[in-house]
């Protein structure tokens, strides 16, 4: 990931986006999400400079940040839910998830517990369900 972000090739991606892009960085992938977001912003700036035409009519052109704020809170009995804190209607969404991130912890019954791969996957399913549950494009 680091090599790809640092070796920016200005001629590689000269395309208009089909729809506004959204990026969700699940717990444990926040650092990588920031890197992908900075690369996408660089791509957006380069596209605006190099492509002919008016980019202001392109869907999502006014966004300054591609990261979408989400949370997966837990209830007292251990159950969880996925919450997306802004509208993503019409967006092309990408989700970064690392099921092996044992450094992510949550509190249950007053104890701090590391997240298992199954819990990461359950949070991923919760966010997909909160998005509408299926791909539209």
Residue ranges and their predicted role:
Residues 1-137:
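PRPP-associated nucleotide enzymes
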